[in-house]
């Protein structure tokens, strides 16, 4: 008879395509993993893996079993967590996918208090591009996603829970550093360090500049970088000026760059939490969702203060 543990072992082996890595993930020995896989193969009377030396790949039968195993293991986890929750415990493993700024500056702040409130919950946070986080949410590889834009799929529910201010920063020796503010058209005279197209910060800056009659193509781009921290440090080194999340500024370069007000330009990006509405949620997932979306969440209210004034 099948049991959830056997399928859990198969799932680890199928996802890693390496019995040794699967053993490390499960805190088992490699021979034990092999034995569980062989037991499953005997049960179904068909091979689940093709083995060639150290190379392993799934057979057609293994490919067919993979999504069913995910469902079975997930159901087993939910059963265990549900029964434990009847005793009042919020427990289980929480998987969160995050785009860059939420993952580095928001989620750790939220999880710190949430895990103190619910010590039987384990959490894993994966920081990646926004679209990748949403893809993992769609596939069920993470329970929740935090990102700077919503996906309008009918399969998802999104809730805005934070607004992240975006500031223009310049090197301390830049002519703008000593001024009270600049007019939008003066931006065309600067060398900019920009994020890549498609990220949340880029989109927020693009939309804001269009509101004052400036397109991104009009900006003089000195450098394009893949994360806000690198951009802030590049500004500190005098390479150019940049629009960056104030959370990044206050935690990384607050005293090493100058903030410049652009008249008529107020930039921010909304941060959302999303979940898949067709997948049953565990007690831990529901608790974290309620914790993030509640209006009196103290850590969120602290984050919503202008970081450079806090």
Q: Which stretches of residues belong to each language-model region?
A:
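A late-sequence structural motif
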Residues: 106, 259-302, 309
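Secondary-structure junction motif
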Residues: 176, 192-213, 281-285, 289, ...
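Beta-alpha-beta core module
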Residues: 154-160, 164, 179, 229-278
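Short helix-boundary/capping micro-motifs
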Residues: 11-29
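Flexible hinge/capping segments at coil-to-helix
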Residues: 156-193, 197
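A short LG(V/I)-centered, amphipathic sequence patch enriched
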Residues: 15, 41-60
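Hydrophobic hinge/microswitch elements
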Residues: 129-134, 138-142, 147-148, 201, ...
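Central regulatory/effector-binding core of bacterial HTH transcription factors
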Residues: 91-154
């Amino acid at each position: 008879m099948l049991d959830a543990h056997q399928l859990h072992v198969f799932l680890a082996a199928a996802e890693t395509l390496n019995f040794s890595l699967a053993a490390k993930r499960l805190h088992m020995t490699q021979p034990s993993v092999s034995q569980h896989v062989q037991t499953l193969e005997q049960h179904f009377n068909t091979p689940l893996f093709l083995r060639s030396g150290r190379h392993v790949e799934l057979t057609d039968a293994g490919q067919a079993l993979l999504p069913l195993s995910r469902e079975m293991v997930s159901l087993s986890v939910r059963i265990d967590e549900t029964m434990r929750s009847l005793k009042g415990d919020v427990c289980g493993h929480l998987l969160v996918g995050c785009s860059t700024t939420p993952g580095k500056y928001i989620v750790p702040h939220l999880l710190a208090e949430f895990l103190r409130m619910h010590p039987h919950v384990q959490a894993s946070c994966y920081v990646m591009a926004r679209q990748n986080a949403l893809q993992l949410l769609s596939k069920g590889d993470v329970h929740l996603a935090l990102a700077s834009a919503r996906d309008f799929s009918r399969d998802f529910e999104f809730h805005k829970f934070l607004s992240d201010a975006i500031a223009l920063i310049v090197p301390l020796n830049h002519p703008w550093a000593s001024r009270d503010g600049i007019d939008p058209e003066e931006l065309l005279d600067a060398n900019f360090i920009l994020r890549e197209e498609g990220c949340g910060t880029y989109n927020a800056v693009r939309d804001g500049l269009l509101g004052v009659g400036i397109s991104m193509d009009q900006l003089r781009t000195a450098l394009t970088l893949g994360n806000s921290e690198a951009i802030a440090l590049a500004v500190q080194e005098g390479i150019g000026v940049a629009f960056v999340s104030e959370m990044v500024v206050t935690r990384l370069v607050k005293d090493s760059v100058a903030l410049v007000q652009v008249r008529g330009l107020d930039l921010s990006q909304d941060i959302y939490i999303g979940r898949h509405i067709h997948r049953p949620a565990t007690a831990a997932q529901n608790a974290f969702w309620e914790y993030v979306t509640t209006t009196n969440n103290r850590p969120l209210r602290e984050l919503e203060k202008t970081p450079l004034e806090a």
